[in-house]
Amino acid sequence: MTMTPREIVAELDKFIIGQNDAKRAVAIALRNRWRRMQLGEELRREIFPKNILMIGPTGVGKTEIARRLSDLAGAPFLKIEATKFTEVGYVGRDVESIIRDLVDVAVKMTREKAIRQVKSLAEEAAEERVLDALIPPARGGFQGEPTAEEKPTEKKESATRQLFRKKLRNGGLDDKEIEVEVSAHPSFEIMGPPGMEEMVSQLQGIMSSMSSRRSKSRRLKVKDALRILGEEEAAKLVDEDQIKSTALASVEQNGIVFIDEIDKIVKRDGAVGADVSREGVQRDLLPLVEGSTVFTKYGMVKTDHILFIASGAFHIAKPSDLVPELQGRFPIRVELKALTADDFVRILTEPKASLTEQYTELLKTENFGLSFTKDGIKRLAEIAYQVNDRSENIGARRLHTIMERLLEEVSFEATDKQGESITIDADYVNKQLKKLAEDEDLSRYIL
């Protein structure tokens, strides 16, 4: 991570409107990962990440920050829902599977990077195998036959091979079918009960390694053969042991886990029965966040320096309802603000791939023009804010519902009206949505 905090915030600004406190907090946390790695090993061991707790209503950008952060991090990153996990002893996934999944992400990232480095060598090897299939090598003669007689044949064969190589690189043979030997991959999935994912994964790995030693003959088009053989050759060239050790080190030093919906595992006041397992999940999470050692199929992983970012709406429970030990492990608290009508106007127009741009480009594929006026966008934002205010406040997600309702007729008829166009202004928005927005009973069910 070589980006400065200011650059990280600027990048997040392209996709997320407002919420500067949250952006600054995650930007500083990301940069601190880089700063720590510049220190000596002894001091580096003593510096632990400051975990972040993001608090705010639904639809204000918590999950979107996580999504964009994963693109910027350049490090093993995993986003999980806290509600997917159960206390040890209950049916479901245990929290240690978070670290196992994070290691899987790291191994995949490291392998992809290693494969990119050997891509040109792998492509050359794949090309030779395809040429061997197109021009089978000449069979050897009788024992003791003079080698001098073989040389003209070799030259002739080499010239033919060069001609085919040129055609192959120009794409002239892409659709020709050839028969090649490829590794046989298992065509079955091992199913296991909840909580046994690690054992199932190991069994799957054993079966895959056994079957990968065998090969089978397949008839493929040349372009498909080049791709499949290229992948095979790349897999032969990379060092799997090196990939695993690099991935484990990357997880331990730079791993980031984003825990969404953490408020859903808070025990509610006066609740009995199944709610007991909510507190159990928190207590199971505690060792991971504090720092522990987790066994994975690639080796042991220490979680001491993994950064945890948690988020939740906390509209029923409060952050203080988390078990005290877990509260203490999230020292940085960031509150995200509810969105206003002005924020909705900005969300509809400013971000990269904004909603208005998405619908415009979608209908452009039908040769149908769609444009929005400023007053049309303002009216859309006002209606979204009003509906949120009167019924359940779901933040920016309300805009998706309203846009779909607004453009339902246009999207349906666009195919029959190619070459035409429409401008969405305030009058059009009122015509389509005003009655629904004003009728509280209807807006609850439709918008």
UniProtKB/Swiss-Prot annotation:
Primary residence: cytoplasm
Binding, ATP: I17, G59, V60, G61, K62, T63, E64, D260, E325, R397
InterPro entries on file: AAA+_ATPase, ATP-dep_Clp_protease_ClpX, ATPase_AAA_core, Clp_ATPase_C, HslU, P-loop_NTPase
Coiled-coil ranges from the UniProt annotation: none
Assigned GO CC terms: HslUV protease complex
Biased composition (Basic and acidic residues): 148-159
Name used for this protein in its record: ATP-dependent protease ATPase subunit HslU
Key words, A-Z: ATP-binding, Chaperone, Cytoplasm, Nucleotide-binding, Stress response
Gene Ontology process terms (BP): protein unfolding; proteolysis involved in protein catabolic process
Gene3D superfamilies from the UniProt entry: 1.10.8.60, DNA helicase RuvA subunit, C-terminal domain, P-loop containing nucleotide triphosphate hydrolases
Family indicated by similarity: Belongs to the ClpX chaperone family. HslU subfamily.
GO molecular function terms listed in the Swiss-Prot or TrEMBL record: ATP binding; ATP hydrolysis activity; peptidase activity; proteasome-activating activity
